């Protein structure tokens, strides 16, 4: 994951100091891209320990179409707690948009089911897209989508995915986002009987929070270790039938965890 450290260094060296919604302050760059060949290992950051349980359960939660944190709590995941209301609701965030995008005529579109069928039927389509950025419902969401839009691409029997992330907390959020979408790409590839291509991450406002600078320097002082391997142990009938125990990570030998505050 040298690419990740290179991004951190680029922000420190070339970034602009900016104010932000949370009042914390950031150093930011605009427009950055990284590419990960999913055949060369699972792109999970090794220069600090990442909480894989949270990454997997959050993805399964998105795929369930759920927008209440109850499922996350049942599985000891608390990463959405700061934004939930007293009943655990978040409004129509990722899961709602992925699985039940409302249309003006009263229908609801399951974008995940739709894109998988499109990949199978028309793999060369340039419309293999899922969007969480529903302008008509942004004001109902506890947090506007940061990872807003992703597109699949099939070539030579391999599936690739590109994510556009309009806003990126590089220290805390980005390691989760990369691993989550890499895993989603693996799952969709399995469902469509395709090999693995690349995961391409594209960032808009790509930033380090001002209260993450010490942690960033510590992480930059560490040498990246070999990437782990992720295996999917079962082939469920549907993208919606995966369980936590279907995923096996091996060879993950990270440096120790680095704690940092979340900007809310």
From Swiss-Prot:
Presence of the UniProt keyword Cytoplasm in the record: yes
Residues involved in (6R)-5,10-methylene-5,6,7,8-tetrahydrofolate binding: 51, 169, 263
Residues that, per the record, bind dUMP: 21, 126-127, 166-169, 177, 207-209
One matching Pfam family: Thymidylat_synt
Protein name in UniProt: Thymidylate synthase
Quaternary structure (record): Homodimer.
Encoding gene per record: thyA
Catalytic-site annotation from UniProt: 146 (nucleophile)
Enzyme class: transferase
Family, as annotated: Belongs to the thymidylate synthase family. Bacterial-type ThyA subfamily.
SUPFAM superfamilies in alphabetical order: Thymidylate synthase/dCMP hydroxymethylase
CDD domains for the chain: TS_Pyrimidine_HMase
Enzyme Commission designation: 2.1.1.45
Organism lineage: Bacteria, Pseudomonadati, Pseudomonadota, Gammaproteobacteria, Alteromonadales
């Amino acid at each position: 994951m040298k690419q990740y450290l290179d991004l951190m260094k680029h922000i420190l060296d070339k970034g602009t100091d900016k104010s932000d919604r949370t009042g914390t302050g950031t150093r930011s760059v605009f427009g950055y891209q990284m590419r990960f060949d999913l055949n060369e290992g699972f792109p999970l950051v090794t220069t600090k320990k990442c909480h894989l349980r949270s990454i997997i359960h959050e993805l399964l939660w998105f795929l369930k179409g759920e927008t209440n944190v109850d499922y996350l709590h049942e599985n000891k995941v608390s990463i959405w707690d700061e934004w939930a209301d007293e009943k655990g609701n978040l409004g129509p965030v990722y899961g709602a948009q992925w699985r039940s995008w409302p249309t003006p005529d009263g229908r609801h579109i399951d974008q995940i089911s739709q894109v998988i069928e499109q990949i199978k039927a028309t793999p060369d389509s340039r419309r293999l897209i899922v969007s969480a950025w529903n302008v008509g419902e942004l004001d109902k969401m506890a947090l506007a989508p940061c990872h807003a839009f992703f597109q699949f691409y099939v070539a030579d029997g391999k599936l690739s995915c590109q994510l556009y992330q309009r806003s990126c907390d590089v220290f805390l959020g980005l390691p989760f986002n990369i691993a989550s979408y890499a895993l989603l790409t693996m799952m969709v590839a399995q469902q469509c009987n395709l090999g693995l291509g690349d995961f391409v991450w594209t960032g808009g406002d790509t930033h380090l929070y001002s209260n993450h600078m010490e942690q960033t320097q510590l992480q930059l002082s560490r040498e990246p270790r070999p990437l782990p391997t992720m295996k999917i142990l079962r082939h469920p009938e549907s993208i919606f039938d995966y369980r936590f125990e279907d995923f096996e990570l091996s060879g993950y030998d990270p440096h120790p965890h680095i704690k940092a505050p979340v900007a809310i």
